[in-house]
Amino acid sequence: MGRGNITEERQQPITNPIKEYPDCFGCGQDNPIGLRLNLRLDRDRLKSSFVPQKAHEGWPGTVHDGIITALLYEIMENLMYRQGVITMMRGMEARLRSPASVGKKLMIESWMEQRSGREISVHSELKDEDGKLIAQG
């Protein structure tokens, strides 16, 4: 799958796509312990970034795998919500490729791969600021 440079002009910021849920762990801006993701739509992909803090640590200096998985989950669920589809995740597979460092910016994106009836296949990737693949969902 090819990657291209993203220009600001094509991106549409989404302040909080689920306004009726300001305490959402992923995108809610009122949740003091949440991820507070700021989302932006780039054509058919939903993107965000996140800088993990000490509170998100597992092994010393490394982001907890549960936080990595939560980031993948949130970006996929929010993609569907943004497209007007309310979903219930039937299953999720997270492939952790490399450790992520606390304090280092992470880039997250999701896209719909396939839709067949009620079945929707959504994918996500999480990379560090240098472009290194951290995880896939």
Q: What does each of the following model-derived ranges do?
A:
Residues M1-A55:
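Non-catalytic linker/capping segments at the edges of enzyme domains
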Residues D30, N38, T62-D65, T69-A70, ...:
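Short, electropositive, low-hydrophobicity segments enriched in small/polar residues
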Residues L35, D44-L46, M88-R90, L106, ...:
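Hydrophobic core residues within well-ordered beta-strands of beta-rich domains
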Residues R40-D42, W111-R115:
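Short beta-strand micro-motifs enriched in acidic
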Residues S48, M92, I108, V122, ...:
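Hydrophobic residues positioned within well-ordered beta-strands of beta-sheet architectures
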Residues E74-M107, M112:
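Hydrophobic beta-strand-centered segment that forms part of the acyl-chain substrate-binding groove
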